[in-house]
């Protein structure tokens, strides 16, 4: 059967403040670094667990025109996150499809300095927990791989709909802009309907070319500590890859943008509502280990487009195993 997708938590989307406002950065539903390969395919029934590791740096805080914010021209932020997770697929069908339930709690360390002359500081703690429920149905068919020892290939179309929820975490401090930027948690609720598809072609190059797309609509509740209201964020995530036996190699990325202004005490943030746009792109490699009921994955992402947020790079490693 298909290897399980690596699941869950916030993509690295960190919004920079104007110098006079607290730093607010929206959590975003979905996996660390974004969904990618097999994103609409659920694993076979069973209980799965694993960990996702993230290392990332934000090195250029930009305004709505994509220009560096002068007061933040020396700002730098680095984070290391570990996200242990569980994902359960009951042995039952609902409307002809499978149901999946996932939960993750990110734990990490974040170091930063924001303003010129400000010292570097670090914070460790627990981030925003994330839960997701999915329904997936395949219109395709399983066929054997051309390579011995590999999972069968699910050729054809698979669709998914679901709902994700980000919970306010416990490590949060809004006392200063720096402490807020360093907080592992964002202290806001996020309710996110999601949907997408995975399509795998017949074996043309190797075992088949796969196209996966996921969409998240992030709806935020006001941060009660700062009275900052983050505008809705739409997030389109994708991967184009080739199945080659136990390997899967390709390109992945995401494009996220806000469709509403950010507000403070109900007033839009000048001059442009601080509407964020962020796109990242990079390579991905997955390796299945059927003998151990597990898979590992690594990808690297770098910013290709940004407004009212940061230019950044990230490396994401994931491991999953069926218990």
Where are these regions (language model features)?
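Residues on the lipid-exposed face of transmembrane beta-strands in outer-membrane beta-barrel proteins
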Residues: 37-39, 51, 83-89, 131-137, ...
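Detector for outer-membrane/organellar transmembrane beta-barrel domains
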Residues: 162-165, 179-267
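Long, hydrophobic/aromatic-enriched structural stretches that serve as scaffold segments
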Residues: 74-140
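Short loop/turn motifs that connect adjacent beta-strands in outer-membrane beta-barrel proteins
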Residues: 23-25, 38-46, 58, 90-99, ...
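Surface-exposed strand-loop-strand hairpins of Gram-negative outer-membrane beta-barrel proteins
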Residues: 24-28, 55-80, 116-122, 181
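Outer membrane beta-barrel transmembrane domains
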Residues: 27, 68-69, 223-323
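Transmembrane beta-barrel strands of outer-membrane/channel proteins
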Residues: 49-57, 101-109, 159-167, 211-217, ...
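Residues that define the transmembrane beta-barrel architecture of outer-membrane proteins
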Residues: 75-83, 97, 123-131, 157, ...
């Amino acid at each position: 059967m298909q290897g399980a997708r690596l699941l869950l938590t916030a993509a690295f989307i960190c919004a920079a403040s104007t110098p006079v406002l607290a730093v607010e950065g929206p959590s975003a539903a979905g996996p660390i670094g974004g969904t990618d390969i097999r994103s609409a395919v659920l694993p076979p029934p069973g209980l799965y667990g694993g960990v996702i590791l993230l290392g990332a740096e934000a090195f250029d805080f930009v305004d709505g025109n994509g220009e560096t914010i002068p007061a933040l021209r020396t700002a730098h932020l680095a984070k290391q996150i570990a996200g242990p997770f569980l994902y359960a697929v009951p042995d039952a069908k609902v409307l002809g499809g499978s149901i999946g339930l996932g939960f993750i709690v990110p734990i990490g360390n974040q170091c930063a300095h924001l303003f010129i002359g400000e010292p570097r500081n670090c914070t460790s703690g627990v981030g925003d927990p994330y839960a997701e429920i999915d329904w997936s149905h395949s219109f395709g068919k399983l066929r054997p791989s051309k390579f011995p020892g590999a999972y069968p290939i699910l050729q054809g179309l698979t669709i998914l709909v679901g709902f994700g929820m980000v919970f306010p975490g416990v490590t949060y401090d809004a006392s200063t802009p720096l402490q807020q930027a360093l907080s592992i948690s964002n202290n806001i609720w996020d309710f996110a309907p999601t949907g997408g598809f995975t399509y795998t072609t017949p074996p043309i190059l190797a075992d088949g070319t796969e196209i996966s797309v996921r969409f998240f609509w992030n709806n935020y509740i006001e941060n009660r500590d700062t009275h900052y209201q983050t505008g809705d964020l739409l997030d389109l995530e994708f991967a184009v890859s080739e199945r080659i036996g136990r390997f899967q190699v390709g390109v992945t990325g995401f494009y996220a943008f806000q469709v509403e202004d950010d507000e403070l005490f109900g007033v839009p943030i000048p001059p442009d509502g601080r509407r964020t746009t962020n796109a990242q792109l990079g390579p991905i490699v997955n390796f299945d280990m059927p003998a151990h009921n597990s898979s590992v994955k690594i990808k690297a992402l770098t910013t290709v487009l940004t407004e009212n947020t940061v230019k950044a790079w990230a490396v994401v490693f994931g491991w999953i195993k069926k218990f």
